[in-house]
Amino acid sequence: INSRQVSSPLRLLDSVMWADGGNGLVMMKTSRAKKLGLTNRVYPLSYAEISNYDCANQTPDITSTGHSIVGPKVLRDAKMKAKDVDMFHPYDDFLFAVMLKAEQCGFAKKGQGSQFLRDTDLGPKGTLPINTGGGQISCGQPGLAGGGINLVEAVRQLMGEGKGRQVP
């Protein structure tokens, strides 16, 4: 809260820091996992990704990110609505990004993300756990591998390996 202002209203500690590191996930067919003796598996219902381009110059609304495209798509493909989601692990390069992505993925109406986050228990045992491992804001962004930390945490949760922060 007391870190220096970088660009109003953002302060230095509202932004993700660069860090060394990496992360990875191994994906394979179920038959291969069984052959290897892997019993703890996760099966995705839907998948989508998007890379945001030069938003400042090419997007008329700077509060819109690629999540406004992929969020509704993955929910639609999985035949789900935001209210059906048990936890949310969005890319969090800035503190306000979680608010925008909550709106764009259908958890809150546009302009109501801040109130939604204030009114919702976001902890591991809460009504909508968000970035239960702390997200990038807590550990940094290792270059282009940054978004993977949230995916790794989501998979840990789904596999029941969240330890003290395990979502029920």
Kindly give the residue locations of the regions a language model identified.
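Hydrophobic alpha-helical bundle architecture
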Residues: 78-89, 112-115, 131-140, 159-165
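Short glycine/threonine-rich loop-to-helix capping motif typified by GTGT followed
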Residues: 54-62, 92-115, 123-126, 142-145
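Active-site nucleophile and cofactor-binding loops and adjacent substrate-binding regions
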Residues: 15-19, 89-90, 143-144
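Conserved active-site "lid/cap" helical segment
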Residues: 17, 66-86, 97, 158-161
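C-terminal amphipathic "assembly/sorting" segment characterized by alternating charged
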Residues: 144-168
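Condensing-enzyme catalytic core mediating Claisen C-C bond formation in acyl metabolism
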Residues: 2-73, 121-128, 132-133, 137, ...
